[in-house]
């Protein structure tokens, strides 16, 4: 506590980021301040060299302050830099008392470039700095379904480089294009098609009506499989914005953010209004054992969404709640990012308040659907048994696979919201010579990626205590707070023992070892995670081995024997690198002419 007292006396008045740590050097909280000394001192009350929490702060903050053993600060040029650095560090290090919003992706837009002779609809996530470009969006989902539908319903130029070919392609043969490349349609005639395309993008009902007519024609012609494709596409497009019944007389362009939380769960809803209509929406479920701070959640949501330059900015950003101080900070952040003033406000009356109420109603509805399930109970029991500080809402599970230390690969699977998130799975080619160095490489590469993809609550390692300790060391060096458990087979005579009809599994934590009955739900939950990572790694290993066998066969056809292939692989590292290497480079490795 003496170190903390000394730090409080020697704080800078500069802008910067502060980090609080407990006695075990675990990161508790990251914050930012225009004046570090003033902000940090607001957490504490100091009398007679005794430090206690400031009673004016929330119970959540007071609970955190009681655990603070020391602090660190990072000085920056100004408050804007502090705001951006704070957000980046929270995502990378995942402090115990900060809220982590994972949805920081940039949503796609559909655009048409009318400066070209024959404009076509395309998808982008970036600003195209040229005149004549018209944007639509953002689309939280369904953008590709809209695009595919437009190309199938209208005789548009089907590919960006079609006009350059100067020759009609198969799309002209099947009447999906008018072949402007051969001047079979004038620019003026094509412009009418492009304008019809615009109308369908702007009016989802018109697009759906055309799709329904096509689906009906296919069905009448007994082309049921194709009709089903259109049925599914219609369903996806209808889900793009469940609030399309809202159509304001005023042509507002608004982004709307609503946060609703209770206990250890919360929901953030985002709605995007263009031309007085809600065109898309999204939500994110958030969990925290330490409660929520609306200011912190809103700050992270706004920075995540607007830190990349977006093609279309709203006239105004509406929030359901936020302190005046944070509102001002965010206003300055937006103005600085986009070099223009875009108002952020908390509506108190009128149709904008009605929009916030609709967003809140949806947040509350989504929240109410998040009922406690058997899986929640198992997670809570697992947390209690393994003495985890956080609920394992998001879990990353790791396994490696190899054959005689060749074709070494690793896999990471992700489990969140009670299901495997296959879009988040990752595969790795590894160079390690044994299972320990391979696991170390796999986990190190994942930890190095924390800045881009925030860490989870829990790592599950397929391995024993050695692999567990490897994981703990890597996480310690990364500075991120992630808890770890490992699962391994029981060993007899230093070998993994597998009994006929089922293997005996042991679960390892940093401080304990658990041998649970096969019927134990907590063991079964960990086994389910381990088995999926094992399946994923094994499948990747098999596909890698098959690919390598084919590439070896191709090299043999060129007169390169297995011993030479091994030399080349040892030197270049992969078959892809061998293919890219020049004959001279390969000759030098083999010391003979190939």
Swiss-Prot record:
Gene it is expressed from: uvrC
GO cellular component, one term: excinuclease repair complex
Residues covered by the GIY-YIG domain: 13-99
Lineage: Bacteria, Pseudomonadati, Campylobacterota, Epsilonproteobacteria, Campylobacterales
UniProt-listed PROSITE patterns: GIY_YIG (PS50164), UVR (PS50151), UVRC (PS50165)
Any single Pfam family the record assigns to this protein: GIY-YIG
Function: The UvrABC repair system catalyzes the recognition and processing of DNA lesions. UvrC both incises the 5' and 3' sides of the lesion. The N-terminal half is responsible for the 3' incision and the C-terminal half is responsible for the 5' incision.
SMART domains with a match to the protein in the record: GIYc
Annotated organism of origin: Helicobacter pylori (strain Shi470)
UniProt cross-references to InterPro entries, sorted A to Z: GIY-YIG_endonuc (IPR000305), GIY-YIG_endonuc_sf (IPR035901), GIY-YIG_UvrC_Cho (IPR047296), RuvA_2-like (IPR010994), UVR_dom (IPR001943), UVR_dom_sf (IPR036876), UvrABC_protein_C (IPR050066), UvrC (IPR004791)
Cellular localization per UniProt: Cytoplasm
Keywords: Cytoplasm, DNA damage, DNA excision, DNA repair, Excision nuclease, SOS response
Highest taxon in the source lineage: Bacteria
Stretches that traverse the bilayer: none
Similarity comment text for this entry: Belongs to the UvrC family.
Name the UniProt record assigns to this protein: UvrABC system protein C
MF-aspect GO terms: DNA binding; excinuclease ABC activity
């Amino acid at each position: 506590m003496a170190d903390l007292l000394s730090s409080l006396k020697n704080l800078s008045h500069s802008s910067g980021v502060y980090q609080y740590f407990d006695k075990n050097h675990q990161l508790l909280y990251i914050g930012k301040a225009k004046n570090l000394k003033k902000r940090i001192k607001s957490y504490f009350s100091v009398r007679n060299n005794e430090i206690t929490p400031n009673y004016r702060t929330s119970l959540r903050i007071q609970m955190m302050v009681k655990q603070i053993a020391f602090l660190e600060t990072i000085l920056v040029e100004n408050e804007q830099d502090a705001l951006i650095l704070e957000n980046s560090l929270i995502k990378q290090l995942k402090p115990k008392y900060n809220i982590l919003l994972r949805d920081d992706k940039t949503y796609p837009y559909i655009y048409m470039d009318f400066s070209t002779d024959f404009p076509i609809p395309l998808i982008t996530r970036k600003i195209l700095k040229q005149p004549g470009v018209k944007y639509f969006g953002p689309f939280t989902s369904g953008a590709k379904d809209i695009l595919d539908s437009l190309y199938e319903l209208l005789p548009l130029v089907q590919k960006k480089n079609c006009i350059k070919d100067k020759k009609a392609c198969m799309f002209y043969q099947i009447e999906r294009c008018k072949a402007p490349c051969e001047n079979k349609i004038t620019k003026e005639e094509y412009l009418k098609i492009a304008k019809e395309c615009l109308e369908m993008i702007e009016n989802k009902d018109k697009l759906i009506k055309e799709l329904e007519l096509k689906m009906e024609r296919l069905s009448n012609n007994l082309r049921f499989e194709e009709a089903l494709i259109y049925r599914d596409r219609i369903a996806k497009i209808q889900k793009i914005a469940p609030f399309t019944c809202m159509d304001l007389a005023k042509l507002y362009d608004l982004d709307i953010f609503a946060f609703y939380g209770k206990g250890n769960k919360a929901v953030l809803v985002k709605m995007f209004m263009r031309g007085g209509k809600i065109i898309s929406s999204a939500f994110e479920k958030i969990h925290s054992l330490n409660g929520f701070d609306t200011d912190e959640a809103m700050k992270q949501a706004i920075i995540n969404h607007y830190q990349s330059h977006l093609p279309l900015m709203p006239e105004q950003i509406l929030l359901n709640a936020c302190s005046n101080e944070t509102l001002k900070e965010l206003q300055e952040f937006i103005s600085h990012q986009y070099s223009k003033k875009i108002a952020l406000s908390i509506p108190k009356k009128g149709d904008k308040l009605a929009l916030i109420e609709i967003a809140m109603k949806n947040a509350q509805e989504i929240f109410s659907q998040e009922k406690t399930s058997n899986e929640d109970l198992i997670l809570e029991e697992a947390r209690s048994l393994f003495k985890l500080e956080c609920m394992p809402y998001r879990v990353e599970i790791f396994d490696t696979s190899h054959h005689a230390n060749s074709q070494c690969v690793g896999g990471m699977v992700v489990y969140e919201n009670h299901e495997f998130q296959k879009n988040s799975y990752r595969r790795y080619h590894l160079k390690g010579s044994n299972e320990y160095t391979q696991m170390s490489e796999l986990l190190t590469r994942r930890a190095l990626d924390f800045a881009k993809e925030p860490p989870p609550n829990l790592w599950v390692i397929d391995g024993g205590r050695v692999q567990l300790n490897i994981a703990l060391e890597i996480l310690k060096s990364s500075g991120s707070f992630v808890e770890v458990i490992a699962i391994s087979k029981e060993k007899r005579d230093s070998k993994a023992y597998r009994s006929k009809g089922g293997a005996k599994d042991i679960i390892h934590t940093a401080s304990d070892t658990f041998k649970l009955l096969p019927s134990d739900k907590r063991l079964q939950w960990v086994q389910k995670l381990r088995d999926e990572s094992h399946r994923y790694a094994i499948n990747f290993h098999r596909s890698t081995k098959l690919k390598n066998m084919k590439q070896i066969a191709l090299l043999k056809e060129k007169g390169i024997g297995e011993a030479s292939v091994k030399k080349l692989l040892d030197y270049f590292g992969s078959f892809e690198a061998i293919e890219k290497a020049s004959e001279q480079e390969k000759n030098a490795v083999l010391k003979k002419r190939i």
